[in-house]
Amino acid sequence: MLNNILKIATRQSPLAIWQANYVRNQLLSFYPTLLIELVPIVTSGDLILDKPLMKAGGKRLFIKELEQAMLERRADIAVHSMKDITISFPEGIGLAVLCAREDPRDAFISTHYASIDLLPTGAVVGTSSMRRQCQLRERRPDLVMRDLRGNIGTRLEKLDKGEYDALILAAAGLKRLDLAHRIRMIIDPTELLPAVGQGVIGIEYRLEDTHILSILAPLHHSATALRVSAERAMNAKLAGGCQVPIGSYAEIEGDQIWLRALVGSPDGSLIIRSEGRAPLSQAEILGQSIANDLLYRGAESILCRAFQVDS
């Protein structure tokens, strides 16, 4: 830390700033005299809004500039939505802390309709997530899926202007920005499986800065980390990114961890699902096992087609 000031790299969107301030306030509750400064950064993902995320370069577009700021020592840590953090890290960067998970589910937002089932044929649903599009197309093939980029406020404005009949957004982001009143329906994971790490704030740090890791330690939530480790182990085995719809959600039940996962074709015509339970100590092994089962059931062909198109 330069001049004993902890510098937090963050994107400039309202949700990202909220998350960075959340981390700041949590740290101050443990260390009232700690000096903390936010370092807002515009990322490539914030600038490229005219094409789907998978065609623009994937989720690294939202984090690479923040990681670069850390490597250049313009920032000490970086705060992200965990679902945006890729499986691999640049040399010298690692994952320090996972904060307690907010609501991991997706939310249905509409000005005229109370639920997905009440949308009329041909209704336009806004979401850029292939995972959401795939599962919605399986459930309602008569709906029109349209990409939607930008921060939460921009997306809601487009809905209010009538450009979309409904939106699907992460419930956690809406709740954090005091926009829960816009939610018409929370979608159960049995109907729409969340993304890996959804609802979790993750903090990256420089591996050499062990003193910063110790400062961050009180923010770490072990149960959340266990759940996300299973989800990310599954994703890593599948080499999942933005090229193919992948959903994964882990829950703790007593001394067991329960993991559900899916891989789907973008058009929703084929979705491969798997689930399983294991002792808490085998969370990552469970994730790998579920990935292998998905591959055995036919996910490999979906992944191969996606990567061929992407290349």
From Swiss-Prot:
The modification S-(dipyrrolylmethanemethyl)cysteine is found at residue 242. Keywords: Porphyrin biosynthesis, Transferase. Tetrapolymerization of the monopyrrole PBG into the hydroxymethylbilane pre-uroporphyrinogen in several discrete steps. PANTHER family: PORPHOBILINOGEN DEAMINASE (PTHR11557:SF0). One of its GO terms (cellular component) is cytoplasm. GO terms for molecular function: hydroxymethylbilane synthase activity. The lineage of its organism: Bacteria, Pseudomonadati, Pseudomonadota, Gammaproteobacteria, Candidatus Palibaumannia. This is Porphobilinogen deaminase. It is an enzyme of class 2 (transferase). Pathway: Porphyrin-containing compound metabolism; protoporphyrin-IX biosynthesis; coproporphyrinogen-III from 5-aminolevulinate: step 2/4. The porphobilinogen subunits are added to the dipyrromethane group. Its EC number is 2.5.1.61. The keyword Cell division does not apply. Binds 1 dipyrromethane group covalently. It holds the Pfam family Porphobil_deamC. The gene is hemC. Coiled coil: none annotated. Monomer. It catalyses: 4 porphobilinogen + H2O = hydroxymethylbilane + 4 NH4(+). GO terms for biological process: protoporphyrinogen IX biosynthetic process.
